[in-house]
Amino acid sequence: MFCGEYVQGTIFPAPNFNPMMDAQMLGGALQGFDCNKDMLIDILTQRSNAQRQMIAGTYQSMYGRDLISVLKEQLSSHFKEVMVGLMYPPPSYDAHELWHAMKGPGTDENCLIEILASRTNGEIFQMREAYCLQYSNNLQEDIYSETSGHFRDTLMNLVQANREEGYSDPAMAAQDAMVLWEACQQKTGEHKTMMQMILCNKSYPQLWLVFQEFQNISGQDLVDAINDCYDGYFQELLVAIVRCIQDKPSYFAYKLYRAIHDFGFHNKTVIRILIARSEIDLMTIRKRYKERFGKSLFHDIKNFASGHYEKALLAICAGDVEDY
C-alpha cells in the first residue's frame, strides 16, 4: 500500500438497521425446499459483519436454530460457501479456512501463505484464539505437523504474531538490507533463517526502509531477487510477505487475477479474498485490479461465475454501472 494512502472496503454498516426484521425476513426466505436466495443476498451482503452477528443472535432467539447450520442445510455448492462465509466473524473465518487447508490428505499451502502473510499481529492473535475454540486444536502445532523445512519455519514465525510495530531505524535498515542481499547470494540454511527473521519480525515502516536500501545495494527489487534465488513454497511465502508490505491491495488484486485466470476460476480463493477484505480494502483492491489488468474485477467475475453465486460475489464487490 502506498504510504499514507486511504483504503476502503465495499461493505459498510447498513443505516436504520433492524436485526429483528432481518431475522424475520431470513426466516421466511429459508422456509421450505425452495429458499429465496435473492433475499439472502440482499440482506447478508448489505450488512456489516457485526450486524450479521446481531442478526444471527436474533434468529437463534426467534427460531431456536443456529443460522449457519440452517444455511448449510438449505444451500449448496459455492453459493453456500459465500453465504456461510459471510456469517463467520473475521477471526473465525480465517480459522475456518486454515483448518480446511490442513485437514484431510494434502495441504493447501497457498491458503496458508495468503492468510498468514497478510494479517496483522492482532488479526493473527484473534485467529489463533478462534482456531482453538472452534477446533480444540493449536494452530501452531497443526502448521508444524502439516508443513516442513524453511517454509514451515517462516509460517511458524508469522503465526507467533511478534512483528514489531511503528518502529524504524535507518542505520539498522542498511544492515538488514545487506543481510537480505547476502541471503540471496549464498542461500545457505543460516541465510534463509536470517532472511525470514527480518521479513517476519521487523515493522512495516522499518521494512519499507530496508526494501529501499536493498534496491540501492543490489540494483534489484527484493521480489525479483527472491524469485531469482529461491523456489517452492518458501519462495512464494517470502514474496507474499514482501508484496503485502509494499502494497497489500495490489497483492490481493494479483491473487484474484491468478485465481480467476490461471486456475480456471479457483472458487475458494476468490470467495475467501472477497469476504475477508470486504470491510477492509476491497474497493482499493478493485481499483488496483483495473489499473494492473485492464479489466474490472466485476467484469471478470461475470465472465466466469453464474447464477446466484455470481450475484452474491458481485454484491460483495459492490460494482458500479460502468463495471459491466
Swiss-Prot record:
InterPro entries: Annexin, Annexin_repeat, Annexin_repeat_CS, Annexin_sf, ANX10. GO terms for molecular function: calcium ion binding; calcium-dependent phospholipid binding. Pfam families: Annexin (PF00191). Annexin repeats lie at residues 17-88, 89-160, 171-243, 247-318. The keyword Nuclease does not apply. It comes from the Eukaryota. Keywords: Annexin, Repeat. GO terms for cellular component: mitochondrion. Belongs to the annexin family. This is Annexin A10. The lineage of its organism: Eukaryota, Metazoa, Chordata, Craniata, Vertebrata.
